[in-house]
């Protein structure tokens, strides 16, 4: 489990930072290496921007401006949605991801984002060795920053709840129809969830014992609604029938 919507919220803010930084770096790189960029444009798009085209100098400059004004935002747009998709998956499957460190989980997901951007050609501009080295180094460092903020923001928008049973053999705790007895799970802050006690035939349900940021609609009912306002725990109480 985990929170899909918390992942979306965290991914939106962290993603804006991520692609905004990438776009700014790409613009600076293009202007810093403008002579090389103009040479690549002239060579690769000679019929449109090269020396054989009418008013070639103006055309080359126009093509360069198009790279800055069109290609850079396009790359950022695609990169943002790639980051958002993976952030949503990060939130949805957060509790199922291996490891206990929130930061490492987020960094692993950020790494997948970076790899996908490289594989599909949306990580930046690699028109010569200098650009490739600079873009590669920046991408690695900036992806680590993205992972750090993704983890922090996900924690901000979620709460950790421990799901307990007084006697797991007699009572199982179901949250949104999933048996989470004895587990700690993340839920979106200020969210509501269906809580139900599955009691064995030889036991009697004795109510719920919420703690911390957990409140219940009816603590005495075996089936109720749990509201998450902070970290905490919920314990199902049970006794064996005499």
Regions inferred by a protein language model and the residue ranges of each:
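Non-cytosolic beta-sheet module surface loops
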Residues: 164-167, 199-201
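Conserved "repeat-terminator" motif of extracellular CCP/Sushi domains
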Residues: 158-165, 219-242
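Surface-exposed interfaces of beta-sheet-rich extracellular modules
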Residues: 192-219
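Exposed beta-strand and adjacent loop surfaces of beta-rich binding modules
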Residues: 158-160, 170-172, 192-194, 204-207, ...
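Juxtamembrane/disordered regions of integral membrane proteins
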Residues: 1-160
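Short, solvent-exposed S/T- and G/P-enriched segments that are highly enriched in secreted/extracellular
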Residues: 178-194, 218-226
